[in-house]
Amino acid sequence: GRFIWNDVLVALFASDVLRQHPGETIMYNLLCSKVVAETILSNHGKPFMWRTGHSFLKKKNQEVKAAFIGELSGHFFFSKDFYNHDDGLYSTLRLLRYLAETDQTMSQAVDSLPKYISSPQICVGCDDDKKVALMDKIAPVLRKDFPEAEVIDDERAGDGLRLELSKGMFVVRYSQNGPYVTVKFESKTTEGYETLRKYILELLRSYQEVDWQSDINVNVEALEK
């Protein structure tokens, strides 16, 4: 078996929803893989990215009217077909129905999507009174070091920024819920993934505000390996 990140499920659910609601908008959060937008476009839907936090997504959907909303954290909202709240059992049954109707195994469905090598969501400790200032320091460095990237740092990013690269992306943001910053990155190639991993590790190590010994750290080994 293999681990399937929740944003891959967002892409599969988007494919399913767009079969029944062609041309509709699919909303997803900042941390999701590029596979989500690419899958939406290939199924003739309209991708709409918004800041992380399911409360922010639900509020924005009062305006956007997306047919489906998905988050990396595993919140899935089938706005056109259900009651506009996330329900794990419904999502599971919905996935099983999609696989049955398209006559695919889970592996076949995942393998049909665009391929990216993606990190887990990485959380690194940073005190609440320092994390906003840390992002203010990091942002100009990223713009300088990645002049070719599309930098998303407006209201879609909310509490951080996302760099869209030709063969990957990465996100760095401060948490709204605790004393830490979040990192997520990906690339189409192993070489590109390693380049981003090493860059992000050295970037964060250059700031004393980052607490590598914090009990709140999650998946830090994905950066340090």
Enumerate the language-model features and the residues they cover.
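Phosphate-binding and adjacent anionic-ligand microenvironments
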Residues: 19-225
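Alpha-helical metal-binding/catalytic segments enriched in His/Glu/Asp
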Residues: 10-13, 92
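Short Gly/Thr/Asp-enriched flexible loops that form oxyanion-binding sites at enzyme active sites
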Residues: 1-10, 36-37
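A conserved helix-loop-strand patch within extracytoplasmic ligand-binding domains
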Residues: 12-20
